[in-house]
Amino acid sequence: MIITVNPATAEPIAEYPAMTSGEVREAITLSYWDFIAWRERPLPERAMLMKRLAKLLRIEKEQHAALISLEMGKPLSQALAEVEKSALVCDYYAEHAASCLKPEESKLDGGVRGVVKFEPLGLVLGIMPWNFPFWQVFRFAAPAIMAGNGIILKHSPNVTGSAIAIEQLFRDAGFPSHLYSAVHIALDDVDRLTGFIIEHPAIQGISLTGSTAAGRAVAAKSGKALKTSVLELGGSDPYIVLDDADISQAVDSCAAARLLNSGQSCIAAKRFIVHARVFEQFERLMLQRMQSAVMGDPFEKGVEIGPLARHDLREQLHGQVTRSVAEGARLLCGGTIPEGQGFFYPPTLLSGVHKWMEVYSAETFGPVATLIEARDDSEAVLIANDTPYGLGSAVFSGNTERALAIADQLDAGCCFINSMVKSDPRMPFGGVKQSGYGRELSSYGIREFVNIKSLCYKER
């Protein structure tokens, strides 16, 4: 049995039956037969249904946003934005899949014509997390389905209601009934049944968004089965603030990037590396901003920070903070578990952070910001890259050329200048090092799960 819990009250929401091996096998079989027919559907027909799906998301936006906030605790305003962004990615691939998948022609030797085609791969398993329960799914599923594939979704158990709602959306939009199928697996059966799904011959690709540990496990299983995989894993994104930056604007962007989704995002700002000449000013303004953030019921207007999604996540985050303070970090605000119900954790600011402290380079999944002082640009780059992760990064400077020179040295999948990191359907998204491999979104993302077929022939 799967039980979902309201993180704002710690009270149960609903119970769902966990699927058995036989039920999972049946779901894969039904999805496979729908894929066989779907792969032959012309792109304009696929696009029509994807457009209809985007429209449904917008029509039903309020009810889906409320479910997101109820199950994982993000403020309702942010949940509404998540549903809208999910509709946006559906629109994007409905409008651009044809150009992304357009065959590429070449003239070869001896009058031979070469054509590169992008054909459907098969069923793709999506293993998705709870922190953006709609966006993470649509970011993966929209391009895969437009490419002609079928989807098996294994969502995080604490957002099972969202998984069911998304499955119904695909059916209501007119997609084949089992082309997109969600499987619901109990926590104590995840390893066994996930392995079973990966090994199933109908599954030809795996996309995981999750922890580095989960990525290692899935990569091992995928590699053993010789199946392609895309991994979007953890991050410890550095935000570098140079001495010529607009400090007030930098603080606004940095705080927003740290507190969005109550800090529970792989591309949230984690480490703020600030030039020594402006460190005290940045620290003072950042403290004011963190202290002014409103924490509370995610359904109340004006709330910026809701609860963390689960009790164990709060315990883990608090442990990282207390260990770092014991190692010498200065706690400027927050850092205590509040009394009362729910899994709340206050905005927390740590300064004087240095190497060997846990928060120096590790991923902190919650509203905890760490300040690290750098003497110059070179040291800022060294600190930024001194982490196992390489997902996102940002540089704040009044000199674009200087900022771009630093961006070129950062080991990250993306870098934003004078703004917070965010994903965009038009740009590839993914990381390096222990943040994973492969790309989502844009033309690069839709081509991750296709058969890139070379065709060579002479006209007769």
Residue locations for each model-derived region?
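Structural signal for hydrophobic packing residues in well-ordered secondary-structure cores
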Residues: F35, R39, A54-K61, A65, ...
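Rossmann-like NAD(P) dinucleotide-binding subdomain of oxidoreductase/dehydrogenase enzymes
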Residues: S106-S248, A374
